[in-house]
Amino acid sequence: IRRELDVRYGRGEILVFGEPWAADETAIEGTAVPALKKHIAQLDCEIGMFCDDTRDAIKGHVFEAEIPGFVNGANGLEEKILNSVRAWSTDGRNVKAPSQVITYVSAHDNWTLWDKLEKTISDEEERIRINKMAAAMYMTCQGNLFFLSGEEFARTKDGLENTYNAPIELNRLDWERAYRYTDLRTYYQGLIALRKQLPGLCDKSEGAWKRIFEEWKTEGVVGFFVDNTG
């Protein structure tokens, strides 16, 4: 399919991304390699997946409400955060190139970022600060940037994980929150504008991980430089 899309529309014109796991056995036969997370380095650079490792490292366990991530108090995640910055593509061991990785912390399934943070942070002002930190972290990682619509104004599903069968009142975008959380929304806008000025983060080619250098870490803190030349 990837090859035919390239022939018909041109290389890089049509993106192919998916969830990197199978719910059950598949009908794949012979030596064909299924497009699962563990096989991503064997796939074409234009075939990519949602990166749950980055998501969970930043905000915490996707299924366990009380298990936090880096931003809400978990220890020992510094190396995972640095791997996330490079879209897990260092030396091509896990991922060929950042083009294969969707960098995100919330999507249509599971808790929204705001609801997940509420599980461990009761004070709203602190939650806003931590939300900003989470956004700043994944928006300064390599890969294809993605965020849930409304995340920028603290989208909530009233704490429910999956709302595919819930009424529209729960799934709709509450635009009143866009005004209530103007500061958070403006912060997201600033991060997006900043990212566009940093080619080292937007580079999705093989070897782009080399643009991240002199990284360091200590307990609860990570740092790195980005090569933005070219």
Where are the language model's segments positioned?
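Conserved alpha/beta catalytic core and glycan-binding cleft of carbohydrate-active enzymes
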Residues: R2, E13-S149, F153-A154, P199-C202, ...
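Catalytic cores of secreted or luminal carbohydrate-active enzymes
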Residues: D174-E206
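Acyl/amide activation-and-transfer machinery of modular secondary-metabolite enzymes
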Residues: Y164-L173
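Short, functionally important structural connectors and interaction interfaces within domains
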Residues: N94-A97, N165, A193
